[in-house]
């Protein structure tokens, strides 16, 4: 008891120093202060009263009243994207030729160019994407099965690119090869984990991605159901072993640790199970997934952040992979599925933590960097239409416009999608169209688009 108390006291006293070590102090005023200053400056001179500006724009803010990004900010982002793309292409000349993953390798670069094609409709980006994915499809090794770190990523992205190019034969070949991985995924005797980066949830994402991007029925419902059932059975088994069936019906671990976050933990797994495309039945969602989410919710720190694992009492990490920026996506999806205000309220609390502590010294990337944290604001804006979150996303984008100027650590794979420059470019391109933005290799399209 005494040890726990001293641990918590130490955490409380060391909180600010810890934050400064891991994140920069956010230099931007929050939306209320920025919008308030604009209202004050737009007050009528003759009466001295405060009123909104008479124009349809909100001068000084990076967007108009309808949420469309202003032309000047669009131009700044487009210029920076062009500049960063040149740097990235130069840097990739010395990248690991054998890394085919979406996380740190060539599939991630293919995904970036696919995104730029989506945003601009410029065919040259689609062809660039094809160049990169062809490179990966020649080097599949069969060792891993997930979208982010295994063969499922190159195959799923390849299928989508070929589909967009109307090369249906090549697209179907990729789908067929992807489905051949399924046997090893659903085998309960295998030591495959359930998490997103290396486990079943990561393979499930690949199947859902195909049905979202190419069309329903690309992967048959029975194949998806088989993977979903394997994930659920695995969670029930561990919950039983840990005697947590009542409190947390679906419990998961990775390397013997019960992680919480999006990358290796329960937030990422529950998030995938709640996707409409996964077609998990309502009874399972209500009886198994919902109480498990609530169990994780109760592990929240007083700050509003979440631990990296159930056994960790240290409030340190504010990353998509560990902490509030990953858990927020689970909470938003829970709000959509269960329609309970508590989930939205806690997602908003996560957003406040990310705003305060999300400009990371680790860099600008997606997994554990500022761009990944910025995506949480875009997602919350799409859900609520509250301009506060669009403003926050734009401010994190503004930070990324000064890429390299803050003295951040240089990641091991500095040009990759999840650790480096490609991820920041992806985020910046999504800020141009917030309504259709999505976190790559994680969020799925809720609308049909080609």
Swiss-Prot record:
Record region (Interaction with inositol phospholipids): 2-15
Posttranslational mods: Myristoylated. Essential for membrane association.
Q: Which domain of life is it from?
A: Eukaryota
Q: Which UniProt keywords are given for this protein, alphabetically ordered? A: Cell membrane, Cytoplasm, Lipoprotein, Membrane, Myristate, Nucleus, Phosphoprotein
Positions of post-translational Phosphotyrosine modification: 198
Q: List the GO cellular component terms.
A: cortical actin cytoskeleton; cytosol; nucleoplasm; nucleus; plasma membrane
- Give the lipid-moiety residues, type N-myristoyl glycine: 2
The entry's localization annotation reads: Nucleus; Cytoplasm; Cell membrane
Query: What InterPro entries does the database record attribute to this sequence?
Result: 6hp_glycosidase-like_sf (IPR012341), LANC-like (IPR007822), LanC-like_prot_euk (IPR020464)
Q: In which tissues is this gene expressed?
A: Expressed in brain and testis.
One GO BP annotation is: positive regulation of abscisic acid-activated signaling pathway
Pfam families, alphabetized? LANC_like (PF05147)
Q: Which GO terms describe its molecular function?
A: ATP binding; GTP binding; phosphatidylinositol-3-phosphate binding; phosphatidylinositol-4-phosphate binding; phosphatidylinositol-5-phosphate binding
Q: Which PANTHER family match?
A: LANC-LIKE PROTEIN, LANC-LIKE PROTEIN 2
Other information = Its exogenous expression in a sarcoma cell line decreases the expression of ABCB1 (P-glycoprotein 1) and increases cellular sensitivity to an anticancer drug (adriamycin).
Question: What is known about its subunit structure?
Answer: Interacts with an array of inositol phospholipids such as phosphatidylinositol 3-phosphate (PI3P), phosphatidylinositol 4-phosphate (PI4P) and phosphatidylinositol 5-phosphate (PI5P). PIP-binding enhances membrane association.
Q: What does the UniProt record say this protein does?
A: Necessary for abscisic acid (ABA) binding on the cell membrane and activation of the ABA signaling pathway in granulocytes.
Protein family per UniProt:
Belongs to the LanC-like protein family.
Q: What is this protein called?
A: LanC-like protein 2
